[in-house]
Amino acid sequence: MSRSGTDPQQRQQASEADAAAATFRANDHQHIRYNPLQDEWVLVSAHRMKRPWQGQVEPQLLKTVPRHDPLNPLCPGAIRANGEVNPQYDSTFLFDNDFPALQPDAPSPGPSDHPLFQAKSARGVCKVMCFHPWSDVTLPLMSVPEIRAVVDAWASVTEELGAQYPWVQIFENKGAMMGCSNPHPHCQVWASSFLPDIAQREERSQQAYKSQHGEPLLMEYSRQELLRKERLVLTSEHWLVLVPFWATWPYQTLLLPRRHVRRLPELTPAERDDLASIMKKLLTKYDNLFETSFPYSMGWHGAPTGSEAGANWNHWQLHAHYYPPLLRSATVRKFMVGYEMLAQAQRDLTPEQAAERLRALPEVHYHLGQKDRETATIA
């Protein structure tokens, strides 16, 4: 054995590893990154952005959306599929989904007769929340006070449904590309009698990290990202927006409170005001990236609720995920197919490159005229 305690082969391997590390550049060389929140890996292949695109191009959405359409079931005064007439609402409007995926009184399946064929009870409620009475606006085109009303409605419905159900999932699918069948600004709320798969993974990961390191995973992650800065998109007094180190979608972002907060209802008035403001800035940047109404799916994750709401959930940190599909332009999207479906997620653009592009974008919406832009910038 050598004096260093390693044989020549080990020294050669160590030397080769050092040489590889010295030449590695994340923006040029493929590598895999770990997602500690959801316990999975993503393949990053930034060099693929140099290839010419010959795949599918989505059609440009040039259709003008009317401000009010009496035939649109989400508009004030419209008749919905169940025959009910919407009120003449002027802010947010919450109602039961006419075609729910979960119902509160569904019968339970019987016991399984084989471990490979298991089924369990699934009960819950599904609601729809309209953000605004007008169909021709989206969140980035709404005022900060109007978005604040949405935040308050999110907190209220979480508290209401969370009194009975262990998981309340708020999510928004924006744009036809993400399967949204109605252009009216709205989201959905599904409350379930069970923890969905992703919630279970985040529960296990956050609990394990807190047990091992003594603090919440996402609190430490936020501190590290604030120090490193390269993936930050927006920061404010109470919130930060970043492209996660492990992002799978091209311009995916994570929205986090700076303070330790477990659920939406725990947000203070100041935090809610600030959340409305930073959401407007983020979504404006999204729209400005390709000068289009940027499609995405987003949703909130917080500590479980229901009968166990009073348990110790201090390992949880409230957060929102934004998953937009666009990659190269308003008409070229990322597809999660093939390798992603059969092996693991893969991305071309690095998270650092995505964050840099989003940071550089203006916080005034491209739809505004020059005079409006100057006024908004001064304000």
UniProtKB/Swiss-Prot annotation:
GO terms for molecular function: UDP-glucose:hexose-1-phosphate uridylyltransferase activity; zinc ion binding. Changing R201C: In GALAC1; 2-fold decrease in activity. Its cofactor is Zn(2+). Residues 9-21 have a biased composition (Low complexity). Changing H132Q: In GALAC1; affects protein stability. It is an enzyme of class 2 (transferase). The keyword Transmembrane does not apply. Zn(2+) 1 binds at C75, H184. InterPro entries: GalP_UDPtransf1, GalP_UDPtransf1_His-AS, GalP_Utransf_C, GalP_Utransf_N, HIT-like_sf. Gene3D superfamilies: HIT-like. The active site is at H186 (tele-ump-histidine intermediate). Belongs to the galactose-1-phosphate uridylyltransferase type 1 family. This is Galactose-1-phosphate uridylyltransferase. It comes from Homo sapiens.
